[in-house]
Amino acid sequence: MRIQRTLSNKKGALALAVLVAALAGCGGGDGAETPQAQANPQFPNSPATGTPESPTTPVTPGKPTSLVAPSCLNCGAVDSSTYAGTGVGVWQATNATSAAADVPVSIDGLTGQDVTLVFTNESGVAQPMPAISLTASRFPSVAASQLRWQDPATDAKQRIGEFNRNGWAALAGSQGTGPRYSMSSGPSKSVVNDTRDWFNEDNSVRSTTLVRQATTTDGVTVNFWVENSENGPTKVSSAIIDQLADRFASAGKVYDMLKDVGGPLWGSHNYSNLISGTGQPIDIVILNFDHNNAPYGMTGYFYARNAIAKSASNPYSNESLSLYLDSETLYLDGATGLTEVVMTMAHEGTHAQNFYRRGVLGGVQYMFATWLEEATAMMMEDFASATLDPGHNPIRDVRFYDYVKYKGGSYNCSLLDWTPFSASCDSYSVSGSFGGFLNRQLGLRLYKSLLGNMSSTNSVDVLDTVIKTNFPGTSFVGQFRRFSATAGALIPAATSPNGFGFPARSDNGYNIPAIDPTAYAPYRTLTQTVPTTLQAYASLPVVRQAVKGRYTETVKVPAGTTLAVVIH
């Protein structure tokens, strides 16, 4: 489901036995959510160029030893120990050993640029983080003044998410050998002004009225139901409903984009206890979720229990293909709230679509892990945003903003460990920001392939396979390294080397805007304490400010971790 926060202001000692300059993809861990390790693979700087992601560069004789290698082409990294003096330079080295290792770094040619050390753990398990000196943020007072959070309740979203991922299978009934093997009767026809009671996710009963019907370009009926106490000119007005109907059902809008990218939201199946696979309308049910007189929090949800027939073991089913939206968000924050709910329809529609495509048709074992499930929903928002509201992009305006500032930044937060709005991490911002990076670097081709790929029941392996298949020479680890370097060093959009950054992209009519990480510098709060561990598939930036001449430091890098040195 989609959660939206309220923001106060949006806008060793051990020698290097194995240290590969040509970056090694470190697998490892217990095998859970970890791609297969490879021996010294080469990754290209860009899927289109076929050039090595981190070419081997010999150390220049007479210069201090520097065991990092340039990781960008036509950029500020001249060789392993020289910066061009302008632009962005990226150097990398991977510690493929099982213990922390010293990496000497010596780079000449700086004229006052910042040096950012970005540690990216690619091992699949948390690694002990060695001691390192830290630098205070340049903007602590600005960032601290804006750290006012409204933490949404997590129980509901966790319960719904877990049910959608695997809880539904025990209630779906027996499977036949062909489609439409369902004991559930087909849907009844509704007309405007019909009344109906709906179960909210908390099992409370809400009385509603059907206030509007729309028809999609392929003939699917879309019903808009509004809770009676929320229906009216000062709350959920007819003008608001008109806008929701237009942006969901009109040609080229949410429904058409969802179907174009990922296929139908519902259809034939062979489960006996699921609702009929034919003739289903889409019900959009607008309820006051929590009666807290405030917008946001949980702005919407898709709950798979409603696609299962009502029974003694599933007594709160609405027996409907339905999306649920928060009414207070629609009318308590004007156009901004309306935009968030419109994006929520794209987000929750993706969850519904994933449930049908991957769960019902593929099998419960192919449902994405939560981190990737939510990432795909936020990636769809990203692709849809320019069509729905050209002035708003959820990755640029919300997710990446939160990534760099949420309670000291969500850097050392595992991509795989779903902890939204926790004491130190916001998983929505982590998955959303990485998804936004993949959208801009690899595009719609990757996204479409990801949605339908069932080559593994391990979500990391699925993403890794899709990247390698569509863009030979790169990988999940390679892309995560580049994302980490981009986000950790706030690489400027104007001078991002090929393969780094968040560039604008257009794919078959889907347009996504560029994101300039440097614009977020005033809001970033760097960690002031070295963490005990570097989490699995997480990164940590450490900044050396305004360096002139030669930057020299021996950096202790955790096991299974890549060190990126970024200068700009």
What are these regions (language model features)?
Residues P55-S98, S106-D108, T457-H568:
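Beta/coil-rich, acidic/histidine-enriched accessory regions frequently appended to metallopeptidases
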Residues R2-A15:
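Bacterial N-terminal signal peptides that target proteins for export
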Residues M343, G362-S431, Q441, M454-R482, ...:
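Acidic/His/Gly-enriched intrinsically disordered linker/tail segments
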Residues L14-T65:
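Bacterial Sec-dependent N-terminal signal peptides
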Residues T51-P52, I308-S317, P394-C425, A485-G488, ...:
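Surface-exposed intrinsically disordered loops and tails
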Residues P64-E162:
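Extended intrinsically disordered, low-complexity regulatory segments in eukaryotic proteins
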